[in-house]
């Protein structure tokens, strides 16, 4: 069960090291397997892709069956309920509105004889990986697909491993709702490799985004450079900062919501109230009993969960900035008062009625967030991840003439005489 630490008596940083190091991708056996899969798909294309799909997913595919057909989409709509469609439409609206606000514009500055600026262009093609098989994550479709759509990406390709009955109808409906028409029934490292290099059936893309297991994460990391990626995401995590005003029931529920992801997920409570800490611990035990994934939750909380009692909120803020959690909840009396002191977090949820799952599904902000301390230097997925910038420069003859000697001087200081000559030939005779 989740362990309690009293930092008012003794600080134990071991728990933080354990949590931050839990997702290091250092399994050499898996890395070698991923490397072999990538090389095989690169060389043998469809043949290797379909062999791995049968080996790992038990699905026998070919060039005719790998792509989801229109009738499969229609059938998916028949399998989902009306309340799902209504909730999905609300989520799409909110997520789209949030990401529309992120759009940047091309800009140009004009001086006498000089024009410079930056031109924005959407990526031409993007591949979205959506976990599948027995799982169903329509929210991943929305969070990865909508910012790409808002950015103006022309070709969005989605891959998701199929179960015995195909890809989840919830996933197919979500993709169709946001206009993704090119969907393939593949997953794992082999799908990532297929998107990076292209095969006879799968198009090559410029960028790959979306979550997956360790094979998917390692493949994305290995292929970065051949193709752009969003990030190498680790296990999910939440840090809750709470004071005596917080509801033990709410805090416990929020910690449990992350612990159910998998046994590597991390759920931490940092509180100024020992009484709250004890109540939350009891509430966790009570709520766990009626949750479906309680075995996973128990393992997660045992290995990577913690309830930490500290002296004051300043210490709590220091812990949050050090851990740089994926999700940070501020369940305190005046959360906006300390927001300015939070430097490192993927997403911040303020107040007792802003639970993390609200951000996972419906509110609008993206749920693709940096994990494992990388919120110190990475940001959430956004429209900007699907846009590239080109610098633009124009000088008239007169404008170049006014700075030619300076350019020549700087080039010669670096002993790049051809650079200097490129300017000289425009003004000086041989």
Curated annotation (Swiss-Prot):
Keyword Iron: no
Designated name of the protein: Histidinol dehydrogenase
Cofactor(s) of this protein: Zn(2+)
Record-linked InterPro entries: Ald_DH/histidinol_DH, Histidinol_DH_CS, Histidinol_DH_monofunct, Hstdl_DH
A molecular-function term among this protein's GO annotations: zinc ion binding
Keyword Magnesium set for record: no
Organism taxonomic ancestry: Bacteria, Bacillati, Bacillota, Clostridia, Thermoanaerobacterales
Catalytic residues (positions): 326-327
Matches recorded under HAMAP family: HisD
Chain sites annotated for binding NAD(+): 129, 190, 213
Similarity comment text for this entry: Belongs to the histidinol dehydrogenase family.
PROSITE patterns assigned to the protein according to its UniProt record, in alphabetical order: HISOL_DEHYDROGENASE
Gene that produces this protein: hisD
A Pfam family reported for this protein in Swiss-Prot or TrEMBL: Histidinol_dh
Keyword annotations: Amino-acid biosynthesis, Histidine biosynthesis, Metal-binding, NAD, Oxidoreductase, Zinc
Species annotation: Caldanaerobacter subterraneus subsp. tengcongensis (strain DSM 15242 / JCM 11007 / NBRC 100824 / MB4)
Uppermost EC category: oxidoreductase
UniProt catalytic activity: L-histidinol + 2 NAD(+) + H2O = L-histidine + 2 NADH + 3 H(+)
One biological process term in Gene Ontology: L-histidine biosynthetic process
GO cellular component: cytosol
